[in-house]
């Protein structure tokens, strides 16, 4: 993607990954109501411009809807899976204050994020085998230096059970 347009750094993976708000699984929809004019909504405009892309990147399951120039004062509304709605007033707040506030009320705790990261690292540990969805390797034969699968390359005669049984029977 070319680095053109207004503030193109917002579209880089490094910038998107730096967002620190990861919502709880109960958050399903987020609506942002703001105005494109006026001093009171400056923080909301900056929040939409700089922080919404990070939130979208970190929370792909959350639907985000923007409503411009439809309200006298800017606010955020979150719809939870229980049917509950959380209303956040963002008038006179800066975009950083808005981020801290929504992280505090609807974001996952730091301990939870660390536990999930540790679990993810354990799941993709190179010593684990299983379906590609969960592990790096499906079979032990994919490890270099190991005996290949008998279905792909026939085993040496000395390693087969039939040969060992015949050898025991003959002695």
Swiss-Prot record:
Gene Ontology annotations of biological process type? mitochondrial translation
User: Keywords in UniProt for this one?
Assistant: Mitochondrion, Ribonucleoprotein, Ribosomal protein
The protein's location, in the record's own words, is: Mitochondrion
SMART domains found in the cross-reference section: L51_S25_CI-B8
Under Gene Ontology molecular function, one entry of this record is:
structural constituent of ribosome
Q: Name one GO cellular component term.
A: mitochondrial inner membrane
Give the similarity note. Answer: Belongs to the mitochondrion-specific ribosomal protein mS25 family.
By what name is this protein known? Small ribosomal subunit protein mS25
Q: What is the originating organism of this protein?
A: Mus musculus (Mouse)
Tell me the classification of the organism that encodes this protein: Eukaryota, Metazoa, Chordata, Craniata, Vertebrata
